[in-house]
C-alpha cells in the first residue's frame, strides 16, 4: 500500500504543479448559465453545484494534482448537500485527482475514531467493514493533543491515508492563540509543529516527508519559515494564496531544494476566475471553466517561478 504523501508528491511531480483547487461552492458563485437550468430548491441547487464542480474538475484534471473539498459548504445543504459531497469526491477520484477533505475534525476516543472511520478508515456494518468516503487526506484539529490525533494516524497507517494537522492558519485572528508564548519562550504554533513532526515519524515516505502533514497559512511568511525550520519532514497544505493575499515568493520558503514541501490551495481565485478583473473581459460567463483553467496555469507558473528563484 503506497504512502499517501508519496501518492500526492508523485502527482505533483507528474504535473509539475504544487497546486490544489479548493471546491467551496455557494450558489451565488455559480454562473447564471448553470443556475437557470435547475429548480430553486435544495435538490436543484445541489444539482447545479454538482454540474459546476464537474466542469471545474474536467477543466483542470490534467494540470492540477488535487482538489480540497471543504465539507462545510456541503453540510449546509443537509442530506442533499452530503450526497453532493459524496458525488463530488467520487467524480474527483474517477478523474484521478488526489482528494483532500477539509473538515478540521477534532475530538477524542470513540468520537475521533468515528470521524476517522468515515473519512480515512472503514465503518463496521454487521460482520464487514465498509469504506464510506473515498478520499486521501483529512484536515485535523490538534487542540486536544495526541488523544484527538492518534485515531487518525492509526488509520493512516492501516489504510494508506494522510492528515493535515492545523498548525498556523491563514485567518487574521489566528495569532490570538497560535502565536501565544509558552514555557521556554516558544510560540504555541512552534510547539504544535514539533509535535506534528514527531507524530509523523513512522509515516515518512520515499521523499522523506510524512503522511502526517500540516496546514500552514500563506499569509504569515515568518511563521511559515519558522515552522519549516522545526518540521523538516512535514508536508504543508498552504491556504491563503490569491484572494487572501498570500504571495508566491513568501510561499516558496516552505519548499526544499527539490521543489517539494508544500501544496498551495486556491479556492475563490480558481472557482470564480471568470468574475476576476484578470479574466472577466477575456471569457464569457458560459466559459467559466476555461477561465479557471487559465488561472490555474497562471498560478502554477507563478508558484514554480518563485520556488525555482528563491
Name what the model sees in each region:
Residues 76-91, 108-114, 144-157, 219-227, ...:
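Active-site-adjacent beta->alpha loops and helix N-cap segments on the catalytic face
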Residues 251-257, 272-310:
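C-terminal helical cap(s) of enzyme catalytic domains, especially alpha/beta-barrels
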Residues 218-265, 269-276:
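A C-terminal functional module that forms or caps the active site or interfaces directly
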Residues 1-69, 74-87, 91-96, 100, ...:
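Conserved N-terminal beta1-alpha1 strand-loop-helix module at the mouth
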Residues 107-212:
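Conserved anion-binding
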Residues 64, 134-136, 157-163, 208, ...:
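Glycine-enriched alpha-helix->loop->beta-strand junction motifs that scaffold or abut catalytic
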Residues 25-27, 71-75, 105-107, 142-144, ...:
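Active-site-proximal loop/turn and secondary-structure-junction residues that shape catalytic pockets
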Residues 21, 67, 102, 138, ...:
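Conserved, mostly hydrophobic/aromatic
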